[in-house]
């Protein structure tokens, strides 16, 4: 699966927007390649365009790792509706159904 990611980070009084793609998704986080670099430990706002979701999923996430432009994120404070969408998408990926 190819997921579009949009990330916003607030630094030095300015909001910076990055975008990218991912093919790694779990119930607790996502990995992807972005158009710029983030630092490990930064908290970002992100939007994920997922199948089974009528609108992009808006989440807060913590940067857990970075290798070049490749980043790993851990989702923070997920509500029940967001958790349900993530679970359904992950189940769909595990079974190979659409």
Question: Which residues does each PLM region occupy?
Answer:
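Structured alpha-helical
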Residues: 1-98
């Amino acid at each position: 699966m190819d997921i579009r990611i949009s990330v916003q980070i607030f630094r030095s009084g300015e909001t910076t927007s990055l975008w990218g793609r991912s093919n790694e998704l779990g119930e607790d986080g996502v990995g992807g390649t972005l158009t710029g670099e983030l630092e490990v430990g930064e908290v970002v706002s992100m939007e994920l365009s997922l199948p089974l979701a009528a609108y992009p999923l808006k989440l807060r996430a913590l940067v857990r790792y970075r290798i070049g432009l490749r980043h790993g994120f851990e989702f923070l404070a997920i509500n029940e509706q967001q958790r349900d969408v993530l679970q359904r998408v992950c189940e769909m990926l595990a079974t190979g159904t659409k």
